[in-house]
């Protein structure tokens, strides 16, 4: 079970059919053990080769969520832990200042695709199984359910998020397939659309879903301009992460950045305005990244010519 908890299951009296099931289970368990050892060796090689490593506590949480089926049922890892995964996917090491966090942010759509099986992944149960002391964080409005879980006295925290609807309601949304409430946030549907598989590297590997690098970068540009003045540090972190990803994409995958920009344009003038403001802000944080994005995105190049 999630958290490595052993569970006994009674499958009936011993019969030839049951004996075959047991034999097949033992064979598959042996094969799984061999696969797990291979993954652990691979992760050790990645660590030795300089891959970005997720801290042990966060990796335990992500493994429990993955084991419970969260990422199979549409959950997407976002935030700084996703940034770490993207670094390994792109074969790069990010600056350490942009990697500091113990916040585990998981986003999902409130409605489920008909292509997904009618299964459930119980997030509160998965966190409880870890026996790390996770407790629900009370909402500011006592009438609303919690959308976060935190270990008392520590910085480790899990936030559950969902795209904000067109009605712009910030009221938590109950998501039945995860047995949890999620906090609606604007611009999130752009980020998690078309998410792709990735791996968290620690002592072993954890398969998860992360945003595409291009959407991750453009989303960071947009939300950096939405941060309140009190969150200036987070805004700077947004810009730093966006600049680093953009620098790589312009050199190696300019087409995917252009496609992601077209997706921004389809969402209207407000989205374009915020994204351009983010591009302007990058010039202060990383002038080279600003030059690169202006060379690839026509709207940024035109704006630079005007200024």
Outline where the language-model segments fall.
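Compositionally biased terminal segments of proteins
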Residues: 3-307
């Amino acid at each position: 079970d999630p958290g490595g908890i052993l569970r006994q299951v009674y499958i009936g009296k011993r019969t030839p059919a049951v004996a075959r099931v047991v034999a097949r289970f033992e064979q598959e368990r042996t094969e799984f053990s061999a696969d797990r050892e291979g993954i652990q060796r691979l992760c050790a090689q990645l660590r030795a080769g300089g891959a970005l490593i997720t801290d042990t506590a966060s990796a335990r949480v992500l493994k429990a969520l993955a084991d419970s089926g969260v990422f199979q049922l549409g959950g997407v890892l976002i935030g700084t832990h996703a940034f770490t995964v993207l670094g390994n996917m792109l074969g790069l090491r990010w600056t350490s200042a942009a990697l500091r966090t113990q916040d585990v942010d998981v986003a999902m759509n409130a409605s489920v695709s008909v292509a997904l099986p009618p299964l459930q992944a119980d997030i509160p149960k998965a966190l409880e199984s870890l026996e790390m002391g996770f407790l629900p964080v009370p909402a500011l409005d006592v009438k609303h359910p919690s959308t976060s879980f935190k270990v008392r006295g520590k910085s480790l925290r899990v936030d559950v998020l969902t795209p904000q609807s067109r009605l712009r309601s910030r009221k938590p949304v109950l998501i039945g397939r995860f047995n949890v409430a999620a906090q609606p946030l604007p611009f999130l549907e752009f980020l998690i659309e078309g998410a792709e598989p990735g791996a968290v590297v620690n002592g072993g590997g954890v398969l998860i879903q992360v945003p595409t690098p291009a959407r991750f970068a453009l989303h960071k540009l947009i939300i950096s301009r939405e941060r309140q003045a009190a969150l200036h540090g987070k805004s700077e972190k947004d810009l730093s992460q966006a600049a680093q990803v953009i620098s790589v994409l312009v050199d190696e995958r300019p087409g995917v950045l252009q496609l992601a920009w077209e997706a921004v344009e389809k969402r209207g003038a407000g989205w374009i305005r915020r994204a351009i403001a983010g591009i302007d802000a990058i010039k202060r944080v990383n002038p080279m990244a600003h030059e690169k994005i202006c060379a690839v995105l026509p709207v940024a190049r035109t704006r630079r010519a005007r200024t």
